[in-house]
């Protein structure tokens, strides 16, 4: 198999080649951009193809002035010769810059924002609403509050103990000064530990979703309008035979918002995408946004997607993943009526076996890494009936058809 070429060049990207399948991918709330996901996809595609005895050429990531997407192409090699058509084109849809804009690094600002967030969560009914749908997710939402609350108690107890112990020996002023220095050191240590454990990342994601839930989504809505226009233009200029819109983690509700925006576009009816576009959500947390009563724009998006003719939508989650709403109907989560057959199609898969996590502690301590297992390939015996990259490389992925 040919190795993936270095990132950032145009070689290996051909604009007018016939494309069998184009994937538009939305990452979760992640400041890492296309370069990270290019390396992830390239490595996993290579591993999956090797397992199948296939030879692929994974092209370089296309350098382009368009800030909306980054693209790379995958072509089959047969007897050392490249196929004429492109087997797969991956388009990374950029909203990572919005994640970076909503990634404050000042601890004091984050703590101050937490007052309103956890006021709503604990006292405003958020915890109960989410707890009815997914108890593990509800407890996960409390984790930043519990971590920093316990660390604060530890810090104050240690600092007060040292200050009190030193007072008879060195006086009140010295004892207080040493206690203050210790408190500051422990606070800094706690913050670094929280970042290492992913607590701060989780809290930033909660903060962003809460802001969207308060209808503070103008920047994201503007981006979605631009992305919808870009997708329609691409599918008019060089249409792919099959189109897949994929959202991972928080990217799942962005995916739903974008799919609805596409349907609102005047060019939608002439694009032919209603016959070619399919939706795939991985490790979704749609209900994290849907439970907010002020998220009326998102509720309208869901209602539009439920209207006939519906876009085929497969939702893949796992009960082992405490950061997703495993098997939760996004429409039921916010009380929206959804007539007819269940929508989206919900599929639960096991993930713990992929990492040989055999007990609760091992499972709980690997949640952030496990949440990315949807974006990794696996041996068939461990895949739990779903392999994202095997699906992308299939000639006819029946499981995402109506």
Feature map (PLM): residue ranges:
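Lipolytic serine-hydrolase domain surface
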Residues: 31, 97-98, 108, 113-116, ...
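Contiguous N-terminal and early-domain "leader" segments and peripheral loops that mark the onset or edge
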Residues: 2-24, 197-219, 260
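Intrinsically disordered, low-complexity coil segments
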Residues: 78-84, 236-240, 265-275, 334-349, ...
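Solvent-exposed, charged interface segments at domain starts and junctions
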Residues: 2-11, 242-248, 328-329
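N-terminal low-complexity, Ser/Thr- and acidic-residue-enriched intrinsically disordered segments
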Residues: 2-183
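Serine-dependent carboxylesterase/thioesterase catalytic core
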Residues: 22-23, 27-45, 213-323
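Active-site catalytic motif of lipid deacylating hydrolases and related acyltransferases
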Residues: 31, 86-147, 168-239, 371-402
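Enriched - but not universal
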Residues: 75, 154, 279, 363-364
């Amino acid at each position: 198999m040919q190795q993936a070429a270095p990132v950032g060049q145009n070689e290996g990207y051909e604009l007018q080649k016939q494309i069998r399948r184009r994937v538009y991918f939305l990452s979760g709330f992640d400041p890492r951009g296309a370069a990270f996901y290019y390396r992830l996809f390239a490595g996993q595609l290579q591993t999956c193809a090797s397992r199948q005895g296939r030879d692929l050429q994974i092209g370089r990531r296309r350098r382009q002035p368009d800030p909306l997407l980054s693209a790379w192409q995958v072509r089959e090699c047969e007897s050392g010769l490249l196929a004429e058509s492109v087997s797969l084109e991956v388009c990374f849809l950029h909203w990572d810059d919005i994640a970076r804009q909503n990634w404050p690094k000042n601890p004091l600002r984050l703590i101050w924002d937490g007052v309103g967030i956890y006021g709503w969560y604990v006292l405003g009914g958020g915890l109960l609403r989410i707890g009815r749908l997914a108890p593990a997710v509800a407890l996960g939402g409390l984790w930043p509050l519990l971590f920093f609350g316990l660390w604060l108690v530890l810090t104050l107890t240690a600092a007060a103990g040292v200050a009190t112990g030193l007072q008879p020996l060195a006086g009140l002023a010295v004892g207080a000064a040493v206690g203050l220095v210790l408190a500051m050191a422990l606070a800094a240590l706690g913050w670094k530990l929280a970042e290492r454990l992913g607590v701060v990342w989780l809290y930033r994601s909660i903060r962003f979703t809460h802001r969207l839930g308060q209808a503070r989504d103008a920047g994201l809505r503007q981006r979605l309008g631009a992305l919808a226009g870009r997708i329609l233009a691409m599918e008019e200029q060089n249409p792919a035979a099959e189109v897949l819109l994929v959202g991972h983690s928080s990217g799942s509700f962005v995916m739903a918002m974008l799919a609805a925006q596409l349907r609102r576009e005047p060019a939608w009816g002439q694009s032919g995408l209603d016959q070619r576009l399919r939706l795939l959500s991985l490790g979704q947390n749609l209900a994290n946004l849907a439970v907010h009563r002020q998220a009326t724009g998102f509720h309208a998006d869901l209602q539009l997607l439920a209207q006939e003719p519906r876009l085929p939508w497969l939702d893949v989650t796992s009960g082992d993943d405490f950061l997703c709403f495993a098997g939760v109907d996004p429409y039921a989560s916010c009380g929206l009526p959804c007539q007819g057959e269940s929508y989206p199609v919900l599929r639960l898969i096991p993930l713990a076996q992929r990492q040989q996590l055999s007990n609760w502690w091992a499972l709980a301590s690997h949640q952030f890494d496990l949440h990315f297992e949807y974006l990794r390939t696996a041996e068939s015996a461990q895949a739990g009936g779903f392999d994202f990259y095997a699906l992308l490389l299939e000639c006819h992925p029946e499981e995402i058809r109506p």
